[in-house]
A protein has these predicted regions:
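Glycine-biased low-complexity/repetitive sequence motifs
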Residues: 1-50, 57-424
Length: 424
């Protein structure tokens, strides 16, 4: 046989450690889902879409099945092998996929412990499970050997398997919704900015590899039960913006694995409708301008957790007249205190920046009081004297800035839950 020649076997393959032989079904190329029979081999064409091959039910020792990538398309549309209740290579948690171009596999059923074992194959790692963790839920992405699940709304994180090389833990980021800033019909005594949503995070290198966590990361990862199961995920909405005289709204809490991040506090108002003090929360809302000087912003890290999930809102101007309101608190910095004058609103406090998804993203910054800037990381929004304030960005948990002159404040930003672990 010349060097480099390719042999196309369209007959019968024998032995391979099995008691039977593979009779290749050359007259019936499989382009859709099918159930395999003992002793048969199949050419599978996935060029038009993924295909699932279901292995025979109630197999006996020595049963044999073959499969070959007919169109060299498994790398585009993978073949899924449905275990049909039996292990593959001793694993019985997942139905494995074959995504290697040109793959050719002979599977022999050995016993109830190991199940089907590939004896002649291009993918010797094929097995019905993983040595690490397997799970589903949210939007799934990969970063090297690590998988990331991002939940931008309520959902379920389902652990299918915890393998023998897994430490049974995941890293997490739980961000609550941000609070709304105040709104006032007048042109003096700026309302306070909304507080950023509570921010909680863990990092354990043996769990999820090397990445840059926020300063708030808890070094002890939240353990996940070694038994497969489901974990409800709650993602909090941002507090709704208000019209002049409206009572500001806190953000809503986010939670996962029994851990909760509190919603950001609403900013304070002071106007002809009466005074509304800033509210506590994951991070506190900024103090209202006007009234007594030196009013404090809403408390952060409420209820208290360690490390703290947020910081207090900024106070109002310490002197009259025309006192500026305070900026909303952020995850890593208190809101800035207001200063005297019509443009004296404090800026929002800085949020927290984390690379848990593979790229750095800032979340849970505070909103600015009128004419006060947004949080320096951009997750909160600035105050506005002459128009409505902007809504804080979705899934970043920032507080919204406050408004004056009859304008409305924007919504706080919704939260997010992110989970990261090793999967291969």
């Amino acid at each position: 046989i010349p060097s480099g020649a390719t042999i196309n076997n369209q007959g019968t393959a024998t032995n391979f450690g099995a008691s039977g032989a593979v009779n290749w079904q050359t007259g019936s190329i499989k382009t859709g889902d099918f159930t395999a029979a003992n002793g048969e081999g199949y050419f599978v064409d996935t060029s038009s879409g993924a295909v699932t091959m279901t292995l025979p039910s109630s197999p006996s020792a020595g049963d044999i099945v073959g499969v070959k990538d007919y169109a060299l398309s498994f790398d585009t549309n993978a073949l899924t092998i449905n275990r049909n209740g039996e292990p593959i290579n001793g694993f019985n948690a997942l139905n494995p996929t074959v995504g290697d171009e040109g793959a050719s596999i002979i599977l022999v059923y050995v016993d109830g412990t190991k199940g089907w074992i590939p004896t002649v194959d291009d993918t010797s790692s094929l097995k019905g499970g993983t040595d690490y963790m397997a799970a589903t839920g949210g939007t799934e992405t990969e970063c090297g050997n690590f998988k990331i699940h991002s939940f931008t709304g309520p959902g379920t994180f389902t652990v299918q398997q915890v393998g023998p090389l897994s430490n049974g833990k995941v890293d997490y980021q739980i961000v609550a919704g941000g609070g709304s800033g105040g709104a006032r019909p007048g042109t003096s005594d700026n309302p306070g900015g909304g507080g950023g949503g509570g921010f909680r995070e863990s990092k354990c290198a043996t769990t999820s590899g090397t990445w840059t966590a926020s300063p708030l990361a808890n070094p002890t990862s939240q353990p996940v039960s070694a038994s497969p199961g489901t974990y409800p995920i709650v993602v909090g909405a941002g507090g709704a913006g208000v019209s002049p005289c409206g009572t500001t709204n806190p953000g809503n809490a986010s939670s996962a694995f029994g851990l909760t991040s509190a919603g950001g506090g609403g900013g304070g108002n002071y106007d002809s409708c009466g005074s509304v003090r800033s509210k506590s929360g994951g991070s506190g809302g900024g103090a209202r301008g006007g009234g007594s000087t030196g009013n404090a912003g809403g408390a952060g890290n409420t209820p208290p957790v360690s490390p703290p999930q947020g910081q207090p809102g900024g106070g109002n101007s310490p002197s009259s007249p025309d006192q500026g309101g305070g900026g909303g608190g952020g995850a890593t910095e208190a809101g800035v205190t207001g200063s005297p004058g019509p443009n004296g609103g404090g800026r929002g406090g800085a949020g927290a920046t984390s690379g848990i998804t593979g790229s750095p993203v800032s979340r849970s910054g505070g909103g600015g009081s009128v004419c006060g800037a947004a949080s320096p990381d951009g997750s909160g929004t600035a105050g506005n004297r002459t128009g409505n304030t902007s809504n804080a960005a979705d899934n970043r948990g920032g507080g919204s800035g406050s408004a004056m002159s009859g304008n409305n404040s924007g919504n706080g930003g919704s939260g997010i839950v992110i989970i990261r672990y090793r999967f291969q």
